[in-house]
Amino acid sequence: MQLTPLHIQGGRELRGEIAVQGSKNAALPIIVASLLSSEKVTLHGIPRLSDVYTILDLVHHIGTQHQWVGPNSLELHTPSIVNTDAPYALVNKMRASFVVLGAILARAGQARVSMPGGCAWGPRPVDQHVKALRALGAEISEEGGNFHARRQGSLNGTFVFELLTVGGTHNAVLAAVLGDGVVTLENASIDTDVVDLIEFLNSLGADIQGAGTNTLVIRGVQQLRGGEYTVIPDRIEAGTFMMLAAATRSQLTVRNVRPDHLRAVSAKLQEMGVDILEAGNSLIVDARQRELRPVNVTTQSYPGFPTDVQPQMSALLATVPGTSVVQDPVYPDRLTHVAELHRMGANITVSGYTQVIQGSALHAAPVKAADLRAGAALFIAGLTCTGETVIDGVQYLNRGYENLAERLCGIGATAQQTELAVAMD
């Protein structure tokens, strides 16, 4: 099937409730982590996204049997590792696939994994992944774009990450779980997705201490049992919907959230003049009849303002009168949304990783998403404009937002995306 562009009729106030899916960024490494157990694992809250199907293809190649046992529930079973390689054809679509290196190495003692792919907005190196595994005793070589890893016995020792890295922490944790060694990771990521991975592994019998701190101690165990686990809500999707409410000057109830995971986003929106009320696992976001204020935003590692909602915040600020400044030192090249927002009338000047935004009303236009979060920025911008905005590149949106058009319609938007059958020769 081939997807048509997303058609949005904007300029309407939105209303009602929208539920957040399980976290894609938590689900992907947890699916990979299921490789470490020979017993059945059932996961709940798994979003049906293209990235999830990509990682399922990868673990299936390695030896996992899987089936959907509910709308967002997935059963995984890896009795044995049948392939210790992760070829380019399976990993080139998504950077998160590189964490299979640590998982295969732990379960099988050796692995060959190609360099990863993903959104094409600049370099995101994996050097910290490789340095960590080498420091802990793995032998790793690189040849022809492939990493070959081998271990003799259990991983052991201490590694200090040179910078905070979510994926690097994932890989080192996965590699160290099985065996009889003791691994200490310093300057480890405290990101919510890392904590969720650790809590999942511990629920299967792993011995990992320090989740949510910068020091992790992993004591190897001989095997992991099966189990059942629910992934955390997607804080990036939640933040996107919060910004959507603000941009359209609407009131939305965003359900199935962890408010404690969204403190930085909530604080910045409140600084702009948006009312946010916590109600259990929901946030009521109210920007009706408000004169929003420009703000300055700088991305940081968690618990700071997340880079994954930087483009969405830029789209919101493009509608707010006055001068705002957005800086993204975490991923300086995450700027593909800017040229497309220009097509909609946005006044954004870029210097390095800094955007200076002069806010004003936007207008509908045909635009194209070049990556996932740029696509989110464009649908936010499109919903602020009177008239029809047509967003091409919807395959990127489908990497992070399940049934987007249907869910937008549920809160009062007019949005349409269809599938076309493609004739095969």
From Swiss-Prot:
* Gene3D superfamilies xrefs: Enolpyruvate transferase domain
Question: Which keywords accompany this UniProt record?
Answer: Cell cycle, Cell division, Cell shape, Cell wall biogenesis/degradation, Cytoplasm, Peptidoglycan synthesis, Pyruvate, Transferase
> Which residues does the Swiss-Prot or TrEMBL record annotate as the active site?
C119
HAMAP family tied to this protein = MurA
Q: Quick one: which pathway?
A: Cell wall biogenesis; peptidoglycan biosynthesis
Superkingdom of origin organism: Bacteria
Single GO molecular function: UDP-N-acetylglucosamine 1-carboxyvinyltransferase activity
Q: What is its EC number?
A: 2.5.1.7
Its main subcellular localisation, reduced to a broad class, is: cytoplasm
Entry binding sites for UDP-N-acetyl-alpha-D-glucosamine: R95, R124, P125, V126, D127, Q128, D308, V330
Supply the InterPro entries for this chain.
Answer: Enolpyruvate_Tfrase_dom, Enolpyruvate_Tfrase_sf, MurA_subfamily, RNA3'P_cycl/enolpyr_Trfase_a/b, UDP_GlcNAc_COvinyl_MurA
Give Gene Ontology CC terms.
cytoplasm
Pfam families per record: EPSP_synthase (PF00275)
Per its record, the protein catalyses: phosphoenolpyruvate + UDP-N-acetyl-alpha-D-glucosamine = UDP-N-acetyl-3-O-(1-carboxyvinyl)-alpha-D-glucosamine + phosphate
Places the protein is found: Cytoplasm
Question: Where 2-(S-cysteinyl)pyruvic acid O-phosphothioketal occurs along the chain?
Answer: C119
Query: Which class of enzymes does this protein belong to?
Result: transferase
Tell me what this protein is called. Answer: UDP-N-acetylglucosamine 1-carboxyvinyltransferase
GO biological process: what's one of them? cell division
Q: What does this protein do?
A: Cell wall formation. Adds enolpyruvyl to UDP-N-acetylglucosamine.
Amino-acid positions noted as binding phosphoenolpyruvate in the UniProt annotation, renumbered to this chain:
K24, N25
Give TM regions.
none
